[in-house]
Curated annotation (Swiss-Prot):
Residue positions binding ATP: 30-37
Function text: The RecF protein is involved in DNA metabolism; it is required for DNA replication and normal SOS inducibility. RecF binds preferentially to single-stranded, linear DNA. It also seems to bind ATP.
Similarity remark: Belongs to the RecF family.
Protein name (record): DNA replication and repair protein RecF
Main localization (coarse): cytoplasm
NCBIfam families, A to Z: recf
Source taxon at top rank: Bacteria
CDD domains reported in the protein's UniProt record: ABC_RecF
Record PROSITE patterns: RECF_1, RECF_2
One GO location term (cellular component): cytoplasm
Ranges that cross the membrane: none
């Protein structure tokens, strides 16, 4: 797939900017806070409908404007596709494909596949479990768009169940009736238990399936980057039961669901006391080890960077294998975080195989020959022009 054209209107610090991409490699050159990362963010939004930098749509809109629009022309094997995303400070966002508004956002996902790599991705190793869960979920949405609906269902059930647990906790603390007897609340909780186990087991199974595909690819890349000096492993740590991973490997959805219900029973008193759900994939984690040692606690900075680079290259490879087209690669000021060896490994892996958009403040980290067939654009205060014009 190839991104041919991008049009940003009132998005972040871009008032009305069009960009034509002329080759497989494009460098966005400029000082910090000029809009380089904003452009990559717009491409990420077209891919996943999510931004890792903002939660509210109004934070993505220029100044005090009411709306912003991102449009793109994309070339895929099946033909050319025009994408459009309209964000509003008040009201719902809308998406369109080839000029036709799409009511189901699910149908918009995965039309444009991207892998985003920034310095923040180092948190994949050293950050908390929520960072790794978000990484898995974002990748899964690109590979299986229906997963967005599965995850939404689980989160809706989780919110409802937490609200009920909070009521039960308040009732116990008050030690008085509140219009509903404890038995009625308990009966209602049992209904939410069943829904939580059903939706949660689907999330667990898909995450584990993803890791089974991703782990060997990441291991190969890690071996290549480290010179076969280290052994890298990754494992999905489900909190349902200790041996739940074996059930998942056996692809036993019902087995995982039953294990889920059993764990809920075991933690029932703790949940009612705390007033929140402590069982489920929202508490799961991914464990990375190097030579059987946890990378998060004991990995050096160099080892952690090698690990993340291997994961990102594995993402590229997996998406290409599943989608049967190479995804776009977005490199957001990440080369400055890598030493010369890792920079060369990354740039060599990219070559002209993946269309790549790179942000940087200087060109010193690029080989002169690598730059020969690279489009270089200058970014300054939300305005983009050819570097040759400066």
């Amino acid at each position: 797939m190839y991104l041919k054209h991008l049009h940003l209107r009132q998005f972040r610090n871009y008032r009305d900017q069009q960009v034509k991409f002329d080759g497989a490699k494009t460098i966005l050159l400029g000082d910090n806070a000029q809009g380089k990362s904003n452009l990559l963010e717009s491409v990420e939004l077209l891919s996943t409908l999510k931004s890792h930098r903002a939660i509210r749509d109004r934070d993505l809109i220029l100044d005090s404007k009411q709306a912003s629009k991102i449009q793109a022309s994309l070339e895929r094997q099946l033909g050319n596709i025009d994408l459009a995303l309209t964000l509003r400070s008040q009201g719902k966002r809308t998406v369109a494909v080839n000029g036709e508004t799409i009511s189901r956002h699910l149908d918009f996902l995965s039309i444009l596949n991207v892998v985003h790599f920034s310095s923040l991705d180092l948190d994949l190793v050293r950050g908390g479990p929520e960072v790794r869960r978000y990484w898995l979920d974002r990748l899964l949405v690109q590979l299986e768009p229906v997963y967005a609906h599965i995850l939404l269902q689980y989160n809706q059930v989780l919110r409802q169940r937490n609200a009920l647990l909070k009521k039960i906790r308040q009732q116990k603390m008050a030690a008085e009736t509140t219009g509903s007897s404890p038995s009625i609340l308990t009966q209602e909780l049992a209904l939410w238990d069943a829904q939580l186990a059903t939706t949660g087991s689907r999330v667990i199974r898909r995450r584990q399936r993803l890791l089974q595909k991703l782990a060997p690819l990441a291991g190969e890349w890690h071996c290549a980057i480290s010179g076969s000096m280290e052994v890298f492993k990754m494992e999905y740590l489900a909190n349902v039961i200790v041996d739940s991973n074996e059930l998942i490997i056996q692809d036993s959805l019902e087995g995982v669901r039953q294990a889920f219900l059993e764990k809920i029973k075991v933690r029932a008193i703790a949940e009612q006391y705390q007033g929140t759900t402590v069982v489920g994939p929202h508490r799961d984690d991914v464990i990375f080890t190097i030579n059987d040692t946890p990378a998060r606690q004991y990995g050096s900075q160099g080892q952690q960077r090698t690990l993340v680079l291997a994961l990102k290259l594995a993402e590229l490879q997996l998406i290409e294998e599943v989608v049967q087209e190479p995804p776009l690669l977005l490199l957001d000021d990440v080369l400055a975080e890598l030493d010369l060896h890792r920079q060369n490994q990354l740039l060599e892996a990219i070559s002209n195989r993946f269309q790549t958009l790179i942000t940087t403040t200087h060109l010193g980290c690029f080989d002169g020959q690598w730059l020969q067939d690279t489009q270089i654009l200058s970014v300054k205060s939300g305005n983009i022009s050819s570097f040759l014009d400066f």
